[in-house]
């Protein structure tokens, strides 16, 4: 083993570098991750700042924001995903060539953020497409986005070509594009995320090593495991939940109680 190492060091002194095909392939992909020009809300402002001279995204080979999904490797979901915008996000993702990656930037893209109890906000983009790296924050700083990019590069370095689906002659996988129906998001005519209700679909897990994930539509009559809410939440109907969210019930929002002085109001 030491003899092989000595031979490699001697060859490097002569300008000859020895490596494996897999490492060389991964090095090329990790060094030229081109993001899609795609922003949704305030997190997109921080994404724009990351591409400026102060943070110098070009050091990582990711400064080439492409205007077409056909030329992009990375989708940065930067901001709140509304249920009307969700079909467009999935459609853009399907148009990206494989291998393709997703960074969920900010609390809104990851779980709905402060708007998660809103009737029109998707509670995490991983309900519809797989996510490789999550960035917490509201909004995250450019340094956090750089750290996410470096994390993604490490994941790319660790990929094995014989395990990933997209290497070879296997067909690319397209994810179902939801339609905004009468009561919310629908896939193949089945309600998966009702307006004002709870998601009826489980999230995808990270595709770091190329395995396929869940994303199964769970039948409304069966017991569901909600990706955000706890399992004690019950539905009165497919469009309405019983009670309130656990965060509100346990006062996790830490909102101070508002006391009203009626006597003072009467004096006025």
From Swiss-Prot:
HAMAP family: NDH1_NuoB
Family affiliation: Belongs to the complex I 20 kDa subunit family.
Organism in which the protein naturally occurs: Roseiflexus castenholzii (strain DSM 13941 / HLO8)
Gene3D superfamilies noted in UniProt: 3.40.50.12280
GO cellular component terms, A-Z: plasma membrane; respiratory chain complex I
Keywords per UniProt: 4Fe-4S, Cell membrane, Iron, Iron-sulfur, Membrane, Metal-binding, NAD, Quinone, Translocase, Transport, Ubiquinone
Region spans: Disordered: 237-268
GO BP of this protein: aerobic respiration; electron transport coupled proton transport
Listed InterPro entries: NADH_UbQ_OxRdtase-like_20kDa (IPR006137), NADH_UQ_OxRdtase_20Kd_su (IPR006138)
Name of protein: NADH-quinone oxidoreductase subunit B 2
Cofactor(s) this protein cannot do without: [4Fe-4S] cluster
Catalytic activity: a quinone + NADH + 5 H(+)(in) = a quinol + NAD(+) + 4 H(+)(out)
Catalytic class of the enzyme: translocase
Free-text function comment from the UniProt entry: NDH-1 shuttles electrons from NADH, via FMN and iron-sulfur (Fe-S) centers, to quinones in the respiratory chain. The immediate electron acceptor for the enzyme in this species is believed to be ubiquinone. Couples the redox reaction to proton translocation (for every two electrons transferred, four hydrogen ions are translocated across the cytoplasmic membrane), and thus conserves the redox energy in a proton gradient.
Subcellular location: Cell membrane
Gene name of this polypeptide: nuoB2
Membrane topology value: Peripheral membrane protein
Main location class: membrane
Basic and acidic residues composition-biased segments: 247-268
UniProt: [4Fe-4S] cluster binding residues: 42-43, 108, 138
Any one Gene Ontology molecular-function term assigned to this protein's record: quinone binding
Assigned EC number: 7.1.1.-
A Pfam family reported for this protein in Swiss-Prot or TrEMBL: Oxidored_q6
Subunit and interaction comment: NDH-1 is composed of 14 different subunits. Subunits NuoB, C, D, E, F, and G constitute the peripheral sector of the complex.
Cofactor note: Binds 1 [4Fe-4S] cluster.
């Amino acid at each position: 083993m030491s003899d092989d190492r000595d031979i490699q060091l001697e060859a490097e002194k002569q300008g000859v570098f020895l490596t494996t095909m897999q490492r060389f392939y991964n090095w090329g992909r990790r060094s030229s991750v081109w993001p899609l020009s795609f922003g949704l809300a305030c997190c997109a402002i921080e994404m724009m700042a990351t591409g400026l001279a102060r943070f110098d995204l070009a050091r990582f080979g990711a400064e080439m924001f492409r205007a077409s999904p056909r030329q992009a490797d990375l989708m940065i979901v930067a901001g709140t995903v509304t249920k009307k915008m969700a079909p467009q996000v999935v459609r853009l993702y399907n148009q990206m060539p494989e291998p393709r990656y997703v960074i969920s930037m900010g609390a809104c893209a990851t779980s709905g953020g402060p708007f998660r109890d809103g009737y029109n906000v998707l509670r995490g983009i991983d309900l519809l497409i797989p996510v490789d790296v999550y960035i917490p924050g509201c909004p995250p700083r450019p340094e956090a986005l750089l750290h996410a990019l470096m994390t993604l590069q490490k994941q790319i370095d660790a990929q094995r070509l014989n395990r990933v689906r997209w290497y070879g002659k296997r067909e690319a996988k397209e994810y179902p594009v939801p339609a905004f129906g009468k009561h919310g998001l629908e896939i193949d005519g089945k309600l998966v995320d009702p307006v004002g209700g709870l998601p009826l679909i489980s999230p995808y897990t990270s595709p770091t090593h190329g395995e396929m994930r869940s994303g199964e539509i769970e039948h409304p009559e069966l017991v569901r495991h909600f990706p955000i809410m706890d399992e004690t939440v019950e539905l009165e109907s497919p469009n309405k939940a019983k009670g309130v969210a656990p965060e509100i019930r346990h006062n996790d929002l830490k909102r101070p109680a508002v006391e009203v002085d009626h006597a003072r109001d009467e004096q006025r």
